[in-house]
Amino acid sequence: MKGILGLSLLPLLTAASPVFVDSIHNEAAPILSATNAKEVPDSYIVVFKKHVTSELASAHHSWVQDIHDSQSERTELKKRSLFGLGDEVYLGLKNTFDIAGSLIGYSGHFHEDVIEQVRRHPDVDYIERDSEVHTMEGATEKNAPWGLARISHRDSLTFGNFNKYLYASEGGEGVDAYTIDTGINVDHVDFEGRATWGKTIPTNDEDLDGNGHGTHCSGTMAGKKYGVAKKANLYAVKVLRSSGSGTMSDVVSGVEYAVQAHIKKAKDAKNGKVKGFKGSVANMSLGGGKSKTLEDAVNAGVEAGLHFAVAAGNDNADACNYSPAAAEKAITVGASTLADERAYFSNYGECTDIFAPGLNILSTWIGSNYATNIISGTSMASPHIAGLLAYFVSLQPSSDSAFAVEELTPAKLKKDIIAIATEGALTDIPSNTPNVSHAAVGIYKRNELTQKFSSLPGTVVVPRTTPTSLAAVATRSPLPRTASRTVLRVSFTRPKSCSPRSLVPSTARSRMPSSHRSELVLSRRRSEDLVFF
């Protein structure tokens, strides 16, 4: 099997082991290596088999640490490191992880003698050599922002609309958005106090974004001025250092943190401890070589209910050769340009689900609470889609609402976002790559919407006209603030006991273009309970 190293059987050190020698399998677990990434010397990720419980895992953790501590070679091990991340990576067991019970394991820095024993333990499924991951931004260039405008228009941008983003002002409300990256400048004014520091994974690192990459992605996802879902709550999960690099094992731990936080929030909402919670999304604009562990972690997170967007990568190569881009259940995002081309650096291939703006993207930055920067990469494309995930999740009734509908699962929303995206708009798309782009915010033809979403309770349907933007269709609040925009005529599926009534007072109608006044007929139960796609 490619990537598996054949190692000879070494003497077992069992003094500290809670298992007997004869309980060790003769067949060793494989050691996987990424062929396209820089490995972290003597650092490993160990994944348990499915039968392993938290109790068994805890006993194993103690066992492996005792074995490591008994090795006289650990002093020499510290001298051999080439990675330069500090002494914490030489202390044996580093991180443990349990992602919704679907992926349990640990990471650490071990001598090969220890790893040889670990791989023959009956509870171990596979071991992966830890490797470097990094951010995915490209060159910095000056240009006008355009990404938000592009995702809210079906057709190519023109001089009249290249800087106009049409959206629901409450998009993202009730949604937690996790930025698994270099951190977030949580005090930036564009976040309006909605950004919180979640967790710093790299040991002995500080709780701040010393790079800017994570802050930029967060601004695109949920900033007031630069963001798609302008009311989402942001959480910083720092897995990369200020250099923009880190380890695969730390990224896995970051995924675990986001998944656990989501599960807890959802449980609290179900028990009435939290009001108005709609769901959680995560963005990972980072990548490295092929990693089964990271892909398994992301897929487990999606299964646990966390909506995931990941960057396809900037290698102008097949995204299936990189992780987390190859994670099957996440939405993998390539980068497009203002001219509706595949960005020259963007990865492609069957693992790329959709393209979004990724060239010359203006967003929030570090250095001050007002700083901005323009950078490029699939790193910039992915948070556009993560923002859309938050946007659409927020437009569902919360689980504590009297009008709650069936849960919008990550699998369903991924399918729906791809289904309503623009097909065939981009050039320079390889034949094995889906030509799907932008996932425009609320741009639907009547037959698209009724065919794709008619089965969902409470779905908005469009009885006539093909709009060029979401405009007020996705606005769940009373419409005076949006009355000057183009508004669709829509209807809403509601209980028989609820009577529809107009959302728009006559004063709002009078401010609308005459060509649209006759089309403005919206039904509602309560504004916070309308469901839109």
From Swiss-Prot:
Chain ranges of the Peptidase S8 domain: 145-450
Region annotation (Disordered) ranges: 496-519
UniProt signal peptide: 1-16
Domain Inhibitor I9: 43-136
Polar residues composition-biased segments: 496-513
Superkingdom of origin: Eukaryota
UniProt xrefs under SUPFAM superfamilies: Protease propeptides/inhibitors, Subtilisin-like
Active site: D181 (charge relay system), H213 (charge relay system), S379 (charge relay system)
InterPro entries assigned to the protein according to its UniProt record, in alphabetical order: PCSK9_ProteinaseK-like, Peptidase_S8/S53_dom, Peptidase_S8/S53_dom_sf, Peptidase_S8_His-AS, Peptidase_S8_Ser-AS, Peptidase_S8_subtilisin-like, Peptidase_S8_subtilisin-rel, S8pro/Inhibitor_I9
Glycosylation sites: N283, N435
Keywords for the protein's UniProt record, in alphabetical order: Disulfide bond, Glycoprotein, Hydrolase, Protease, Serine protease, Signal, Zymogen
Similarity field: Belongs to the peptidase S8 family.
Protein name: Subtilisin-like serine protease pepC
Organism field: Aspergillus niger
